[in-house]
Amino acid sequence: MSACSVFVYDGDTPLDLTKAVIGLEWGDMKGELAARAVLRMNARMGGAELAEYARLNAPISILAYGREVFSGVIWDYSLIDGRTVNMVCYDRLIFLSGSADSAYFPAGLNTRRVLESICRRWDMPLKYDYTGCTHGRLSYRAQSVASQIISTLDAAQAVCGDKYMLRMEGGTLHVGLRGAGKPVCDVSRARLISYTHRRDMSGLVTRVAITTGSSGPVRVREVFDGDTSLGILQEVVDASGATLSDARTQARRLLIERGTPVETIEVACQDEPTLRRGDRVTVSAGSLAGEYDVLGVMHDRLLSMQMELARHTDGEG
């Protein structure tokens, strides 16, 4: 019996395609809003053409040990030489990524109310347990619905400092704190296949100078230092067209966002099929020790997974 099962739905009737599966991956990729599944299958199953069952926009689900780990629709279907079929499937968030709309929100609304309004227009159930902030005026013109949601959350994150996560859970869009709750799994050296831990000073800022003087000599008004132990890498904030208070806020934000080297952590290990983007894991292997947030994860039918991680920080979860 395979640990993974694949079902496509004809109305309410599930059709088991597991025996046709040759290759299977699923998960939440960093930089992609919608969860994705990629399947490679035999074009015929039980004497019938797979195309009779697997149609574009047909609901599809993947189960691991009897528990659903992916639910979406067939988005891309390719028949190759009449023998194999490649399918790319996404969850419902793909419709928000592929749909453009315009929306206006007056100043004074909090993040929850903005997202509730956007989701209501698109018949998307919302579970919200993120912190958020009070927003200024928001105007979205001919932007994808997904972009409106992400832009709103990015603005809130910049103000409150709490990292957010969003993902589909059982037909509901869940917006919450990244890394909330207890670690989902413990990746020790016994479960580890490989890892890459990279630190990069590109884009690092250790000092910010605030300047004025748009029409005359440039004057340095203030200097903010971060961690200069790695040397001086300076950014300049021009306060000529803004208040000094706003310039100070921008300088502090630069040091928060870019004041430490960029860290890239990739881990391959034995699978935890239910692990999702936004979950927290514990890792103890080589230079990695502690709790990490999952930025992206892909699982496969061979019961291994590839994760991209970020260090979990206090205040998240």
Stretches found by the model and what they are:
Residues 1-96, 184-196:
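Assembly/oligomerization scaffold segments
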Residues 19, 61-89, 165, 281-311:
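Short beta-strand and beta-hairpin "edge-sheet" elements
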Residues 2-7, 154, 163-300, 304, ...:
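Acidic, small/polar-enriched beta strand-loop surface segments
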Residues 81-191, 195-197:
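Charged- and aromatic-enriched interaction segments used to assemble
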